[in-house]
C-alpha cells in the first residue's frame, strides 16, 4: 500500500517538474521573401524591419550569406501593449521599448533588463538572391 501511494504521488508531482513557464508569443503565420542585394538592400552588419509576424520582424545580416531573423515582440511579456524591440545605433544590440530588456543581435541572447529569454527566431533560407523567411 505504501509503494502504491509513493507511485501515485510521483505520477502527480514529476510531470509538473519540467513545465516551461516561458510566456508564449502568439503564433502568426510567416512566409516572406526579401531580396537583400537589390530592392531590400541590407548591408553586412545591417538590419531591416519587416511588417510581418506578431509585432514585426527584424532581419540582421551578419555576413554575405548569414542572417538572423527575429520576432520584434519582447519574449519577457508578449502581451504588453507597445512592447517592441528596436535596434540601437550600434547595430549590434536591440532593446525592448517597454521593459528595456537588451538583446544581442548575433544570437538573440538577453544581456540586460528583466528578460531571461532569448528573442524568438524565424527560420530562413538564402539562395544568394532571395531570402525566404518562414515559421
Predicted regions and their residues:
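Short cysteine-rich clusters marking metal-coordination/redox-active sites
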Residues: 74, 94-96
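Short metal-binding segments enriched for Cys and/or His
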Residues: 102-111
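Alpha-helical transmembrane segments
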Residues: 7-11
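Polybasic, low-complexity RNA-engagement segments
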Residues: 114
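N-terminal pre-ligand scaffold of iron-sulfur
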Residues: 18-89, 104-105, 120-135
Amino acid at each position: 500500500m505504501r509503494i502504491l501511494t509513493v507511485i501515485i504521488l510521483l505520477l502527480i508531482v514529476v510531470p509538473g517538474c519540467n513545465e516551461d513557464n516561458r510566456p508564449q508569443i502568439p503564433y502568426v503565420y510567416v512566409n516572406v521573401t526579401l531580396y537583400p542585394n537589390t530592392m531590400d538592400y541590407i548591408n553586412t552588419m545591417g538590419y531591416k524591419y519587416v511588417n510581418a509576424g506578431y509585432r514585426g520582424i527584424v532581419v540582421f545580416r551578419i555576413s554575405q550569406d548569414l542572417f538572423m531573423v527575429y520576432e520584434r515582440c519582447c519574449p519577457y511579456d508578449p502581451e504588453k501593449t507597445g512592447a517592441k524591440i528596436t535596434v540601437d545605433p550600434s547595430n549590434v544590440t536591440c532593446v525592448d521599448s517597454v521593459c528595456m530588456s537588451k538583446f544581442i543581435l548575433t544570437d538573440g541572447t538577453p544581456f540586460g533588463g528583466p528578460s531571461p529569454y532569448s528573442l524568438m527566431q524565424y527560420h530562413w533560407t538564402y539562395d544568394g538572391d532571395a531570402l525566404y523567411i518562414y515559421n
